[in-house]
Amino acid sequence: SNMELAANMLLAYHAPLEAPMQKELTCPACGHSVIQYLNPAPTTDVVIYDPERGVVVIERVNEPHGFALPGGFVDDGEQVEHAAVREMREETGLDVELLGVLGVYSRPDRDPRRHTMSVVFVGRPRDAAALKAGDDAARAAFYPLDRLPQPICFDHARILADFGRWLAGERTLAPVEPA
């Protein structure tokens, strides 16, 4: 019956998740029970593109080792666009103009360290010659899309493929929120 179907759907909807979304902790000071929510960490990455040089790829100092787009974590109280510009300056020395949002990438396995959710921008360097590795980048260089170094970490190969589709006119960018 419809009522039985609705009841089963409701039970299925309220079934426990495979991975816990929260855990119960005890406050060491007062002994009260508190809930810690296990949310993805907000991050941002930027495909910095110069038509003559290609895209900026960094070689990572920290685990996982390999090559990646420059990016990092959004600080508490920080607008994601500001975090993107800050991270580019820290990792590449470049002052970047954000052209638009390529996409949001949030697969739980995209980063082996923890679940992250990245807002990925396409950016243009104001002075491409200022490129220099910094922060947690061993090296930073421009690479043509057809000659990227390997291995590419995280889901950045997928992001770069999406960027290639944007360059080919097969994808659009979402606007950047004004500061």
Each model region followed by its residue ranges:
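Conserved Nudix-box catalytic region and its N-terminal flanking loop in Nudix hydrolases
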Residues: 50-91
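Acidic, metal-coordinating catalytic segment for phosphate/diphosphate chemistry
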Residues: 14-45
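Extreme N-terminal basic, low-complexity initiation segments
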Residues: 1-12
